[in-house]
Amino acid sequence: MSSREIRIATRQSALALWQAEYVKARLEQAHPGLTVTLLPMTSRGDKLLDAPLAKIGGKGLFVKELETALLEGAADIAVHSMKDVPMDFPEGLGLYTICEREDPRDAFVSNTYASLEQLPAGSVVGTSSLRRQAQLLARRPDLQIRFLRGNVNTRLAKLDAGEYDAIILAAAGLIRLGFESRIRSSISVDDSLPAGGQGAVGIECRTADSDLHALLEPLHHSDTALRVTAERALNKRLNGGCQVPIACYAIREGDQLWLRGLVGQPDGTQLLRAEGRAPLAEAEALGVRVAEDLLEQGAEAILEAVYGEAGHP
């Protein structure tokens, strides 16, 4: 990296490119004269579209190739959806910036029905997420949940082709890509607790690049970072990746954080819930504490069964 050039490693999906372009624009706005270029690449998770994420196994399905580009010096920063970022980083890399969060909720999308409540019994609902599946079936065990992978455009096309009565997507992705009008209703966090980091964009770079860290500082949103720190600490304590039925969501209440966590049986027959509050400075400890509460309720057995089916630890 020259002092006036930054190369961004990004996935090639429309949403990933939107996020990278957003970071590019913010950097150029903050630092006139800075040159920012995109380096699009395909991740393992993008290539394996014919199986549910939980069955592919492994963590970092959507980030490993980007991290390799950082380690080899081909790129200077990598832009990620925070819900895809593993808890641990390769030696020499770290997460230095978390941008302001978009709407963290799940969105109900259908061409026929206005809300989840309106779906008739037996309706087919598409999702790639065991977290969404567990919470959907807990509320509506009469629904059929069918596997749905692919980028946002692909998923919408499958809905439009009549393969599903409704699909559930992250509201943030639809909003960012200009598909907000496709959202029939946003599902409250009480009814569908989001994935840790959902709606937030993170920037990863080499730990030794202190000059670069300073350039990224204007993009950092401290409130979002505190909330995501608590959520990620919960995920880490539960050894969770982006393809397990773990949900968590933190909000700031004055000088405190309120964190809610959930672990669910994929068939919706059991949802374990926990919550806690702590001062802002104790975000990480709060995440661990709420995770411990879930473990005491039996979360480990649920997660081990999911990992066992996926064929990985």
From Swiss-Prot:
The modification S-(dipyrrolylmethanemethyl)cysteine is found at C242. It catalyses: 4 porphobilinogen + H2O = hydroxymethylbilane + 4 NH4(+). Binds 1 dipyrromethane group covalently. It is an enzyme of class 2 (transferase). Keywords: Porphyrin biosynthesis, Transferase. One of its GO terms (cellular component) is cytoplasm. GO terms for biological process: protoporphyrinogen IX biosynthetic process. Pfam families: Porphobil_deam, Porphobil_deamC. Its cofactor is dipyrromethane. NCBIfam families: hemC. Belongs to the HMBS family. This is Porphobilinogen deaminase. It comes from Pseudomonas aeruginosa (strain UCBPP-PA14).
